[in-house]
Amino acid sequence: MRGMLAVVFAALMLQAALPVAAREAQRRNSLRGVPKINSESAPDPEIEKAIVRALGDYAPEPGQEIRYYYNRVDLNSDGNFEAIVHLVGPSICGTGGCSTLILQPERGGYRLVSNITVTSTPVIVSAQRTKGWNDLIFYATGGGITRGYYVALRFNGRTYPDNPTTLPALGPRAKIAGKAYLADEVSPGGGIVLRPARR
């Protein structure tokens, strides 16, 4: 009897996992041919200062530090490299994802352009542009979304939209084109530990 229950349970788990696996395979297939660039591995003190400023009060307990992944990309064709920064950690992530910051270089440091919530990686920088900045494509999932979908975030002259899940899905036949940044696997021990600012 116990063996039969184990078989039934395993079959139910497999059946539940199949749609998720199929969606994940579909997601990977839609990025076929899109160049993938892993995040940079060296800590960047200026990026860290900008993150801490964006977070406000950042004084994590030991083991609760935020980790970050980043790439430098010229998003507005001015010859300077913005930073796309993905934050992970228990205080910054929810069921829909984590936060991604867009930072623009300014006077030897960075200023916050956008704080985009409920995001996952990779971040696709599209060749399409709006108001002089590349569109950003994210995969919206979790947080009550039963079927994930791609959305395009378009610059409005000052910032990008702050929540991908409020935007319409790209059509099922939409071709995802551009470059996928932060393409390495996000894991609990991965990324760079964000240290609190020194007082």
Residue positions per predicted region:
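Structural motif
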Residues: 93-100, 145-151
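Solvent-exposed coil/turn segments that connect beta secondary-structure elements
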Residues: 88-89, 106-108, 141, 158
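An amphipathic, basic-hydrophobic helix/alpha-beta surface used to engage anionic
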Residues: 103
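Beta-propeller blade termini
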Residues: 66-76, 120-135
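Acidic/hydrophobic-patterned starts of short beta strands in beta-sheet-rich repeat architectures
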Residues: 77-88, 131-138
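Acidic, small-residue rich beta-repeat scaffolds with periodic aromatic anchors
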Residues: 3-5, 9, 15, 19-42, ...
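Short consensus segments that form the blades of beta-propeller domains
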Residues: 60-61, 89-95, 141-144
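Blade-edge motifs of beta-propeller repeat domains
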Residues: 24-64, 107-121, 161-166
